[in-house]
Amino acid sequence: MKKAILIALVAVMIAVMGVSFTACNNATTQGQLQNILNDHNHESFEYAVSAQDKDGNPVAGYDGSYTVTLDKYTQGSTVTDFGSATLSDVKKGILVKGHLTVGTTEYFTGSYFSIISGSSYMVPAYSFRTIKKDGNVTFSLNAAYDGKKFNYTRTVDGKESSGTVDLGKVVNYYDNNEFHQALRTITTFSESLAFSFSMPIVSATEASSVSITARVLGKVNVKNAFTDSRADLQDGGIACYKTAISRATEVAGISQTLFYAVGDVAMSGWNMKHILVRIQEPFKADGNTYSMVYDLKTAELH
């Protein structure tokens, strides 16, 4: 029962709130995304997935793993294995991919960002999401942006459909894949950061534009396996911006809290900006309220 509830929870999190959304803002500095790989070529992160009760005690039956990779591509490159598609002759950009495993269910997500304005800013160009249960694909999505139009092809249990989500006149718009990693590069990340944006949502049951709000609630220190592995962070942990993500019309009260490192983290001679140290999301099961927790274990850069 618990595993079935978790699968439903994670599906909602990805499809509605997104284990990842992707971000861009062409009108204000508040949402502009710096080129996160401007001085290196690759980053990867591994998270341990688990559930906790209100006192922080572990809840059995919810363990999993989540990995994220970021890779730089040059102008004219071919990106293979982009969901069910291959991207040919892409603009200079960054591919962000995620892989979440919970029980026998796997979630594959990805976004390709084009680099614009003299190699300074990231703008989402393509996205995909694939869900497998017991090795079988139950949902897939491949999409491309044409301005503020999100053109998609979706397959649900073998039935294919296509459509367009029009974001209209919104100023800030975001994609629903790899959002968490993308937010690391906002140029105005601070304790006073608060803004709203729209994003296209395409799930098995929905295809629409929704409003999302991000707000930094303050600074907190976080300790986990990642901080324990580093001599410079073992004692006090790492200072993080505690950031709340919520949907204007929430589904079953779903929201997320993200913890981004305040300062750069040195790795292999380079600095990683605002790494995502932890994700928390509340859920209810068996009459109790728990939290799904994604805790950073390892990070690599080259």
Please annotate each region the language model reported.
Residues 1-8:
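Positively charged n-region of N-terminal signal peptides that target proteins for export
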Residues 19-23:
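C-terminal motif of bacterial Sec signal peptides marking the signal peptidase cleavage site
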Residues 27-146, 195-302:
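Acidic, serine/threonine-rich low-complexity disordered tracts
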